[in-house]
Amino acid sequence: MIFMFPLIKISKSLSPYERGLEFGKASALQAQHSRITYARLFATCGISWTAACERAERYTQVIEALDPALIPEMQGMADGAALKLEDILALNCRTEILPPNFLSDETQEAALALVANTAMGLPDWTLEADGENALKDVWKEGECTSLCVNALGSADGHAWFSQNWDWVGRQRPALIVLQSYDEQGRTFTTLTEGGMLAKIGMSKGGLAIGLNILRSVTDGATPGVPVHVVLRHLLSCQSVAEARLALAHIQTLKFGAASNIPVADAMGEVACFEISPGGWDEVKPVDGCVVHTNHFLCESLSDQQSPMGLALSSTPRLISGLRHAAAVKQGQLIGFEELQNFLRDESDGLWSICRSPDPAIPPEARVESVAGIIMLPHTRSIWIAPNVPKLVAFEKIA
């Protein structure tokens, strides 16, 4: 057995606050690690941690409107981790707080934000690397790649989900596997960051969900439902069809920022749902597969796309993913082995689906495939590679 992220199982029959408190106590180190990581990332954009918390508090009302139980649950998370509610809110609103272009051109604002963070006792972890320039290229790198296969495209007649989560390697120690439940008792398992409600995971009913970050020109402009709250809400759904209904309801409250949510269910259906403050749409499978990276594919949302850096690898990774999906057209149906090969694809070097850390970039700022995840909703099975997938095995955790 290789290293695996800590597994936290929440006790049965707890109130929202008690669930959060138990989660917070069990993941206090990971939540505090996340706070330090994101305080520095926000500061790079000219946003101090105090300012980030103030921005996050604007989302309280819309979160309560969607699910009144989540605010007391987050208060419990904060108390358990020896943090404040606004800290937990800021972590769960991190996609909305980061500006659409991620990196501010105002270096003076970044410097002031760093001074404010230092005064709060928040360490600058980039000083262990290259200080001033350590994070400069982080925002130009790509992020996650996903591939979902429906019942017609799979080797066993069931839908499969796969994704690499690419981010700053520093966040790997903050990852945990959480098994919890909502106010109606519907259980779920999620691979998430300390201090965050949910990320990639599966509901007890057999809906697998993931996340590819997108950037919209209207991200964070008005308080809509935060992306990570959307993910937690969808983990109460049992199917792709039910997720569509949930997204239609969330749209009445508006989405806080853009993301793509790849999904697969126990009945064999898959899709990708692109969400943004301007609306949402669906990418349907072609020849049994749906592939996504980090730019909008739906024509109806093309005007939402924020400009991307020239070095962003979203398009090369999409092409690589489509190459794997094309095997279905040639009669080569996709199963567990093929999805492992997909998530370990290094054919495009540092722009690959499986991203190894770039040795030319300071260690603390390297974007890499932090983890890989494969899910089979039919059997509620989850496999996780807790490092760059090329380096480790996929271990079954559920």
Kindly give the residue locations of the regions a language model identified:
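C-terminus-biased signal that marks the final domain/tail of proteins
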Residues: 2-134, 140-142, 237-273, 277-398
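Short, well-ordered beta-strand elements within core beta-sheets of diverse protein domains
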Residues: 230-236
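Internal mixed beta-strand/loop scaffold within catalytic domains of large alpha/beta enzymes
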Residues: 97-228, 370, 382-384, 390-392
